């Protein structure tokens, strides 16, 4: 098999579905019929060009690994030229990679290749912008519950790692330091997933402090991150937990997680109070025009920039400056950008909101540009020819 150029490093758990033997069940029927026709009239060596209609960050590893596995199983030679290494910015319409090989063996793989390439590239783009906008904030990938099955979960965890690595290289960002599940932890250099407690544990315990005690007694070796919004007393419960664990608080091994729902303000805040908080800490963020969504991120209900600043104020005033703040709840690219503008003092963000918001933007497209070395492509796609 020909050596793949600019090939990204192999993943430890490639998305192997479907195996070559099952491709016919999952590919578009017109590809299967084309394969039969090619089998009848003779094979040709073809070159595919694959591109996307929007800027992305190149995240091709899962698609390439799958196609290479198919080539090995079917026993045909495959040459892949990756025009943009993993983690590289790719402009709209630019061929991401060229795939050359037997038309007969490649034709029915197109459906699955596009599935594995497009969404990962958009997810990587989103993860990159989020990490780059908040370079001093660490991120945890919590996409698993938002995914349509384990294959998508793997794809999106991989995407987050690619975008994160780009942000680390470009701006020195902390980026994604881990994720929620064991199966995909390797993408972030971890052996296990990360996480502490859901709201369910607090409901079970009957109080925020008791839930923290239960967790710490069960996992005394782990840093303690405590959800503080269950009873609507974010500030009160956060300070109670800090007083219960003063040693952890002083050592920086205690964090409070804000996950206040969008139906109410964090304890102690309202619209005027939220404006006042940002006036103290980031007045520039509320001086210009803002639409309703931006205002919600800055001074609205839920986990706003004002809420994070307010919690930091209260922790510092009570003598707990080393206690970290973890934020979650809808932290996608737009919200992260506003957090950066407001200088929100958030230490860690747990999010799965780097997942593509508009699925139509994840559609990758493939066209054959050469048949037995002869350039030929449908009119309008000449820009795909090799330069």
Give the predicted meaning of each segment:
Residues 2-107, 111-120, 124:
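Flexible, solvent-exposed loop/hinge segments and secondary-structure transition points
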Residues 44-50, 78, 138, 222-224, ...:
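Structural beta-strand/beta-sheet cores of well-ordered domains, especially the beta-sheet scaffolds
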Residues 79-82, 127-132, 172, 258, ...:
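Short C-terminal domain-edge/linker segments immediately following a structured domain
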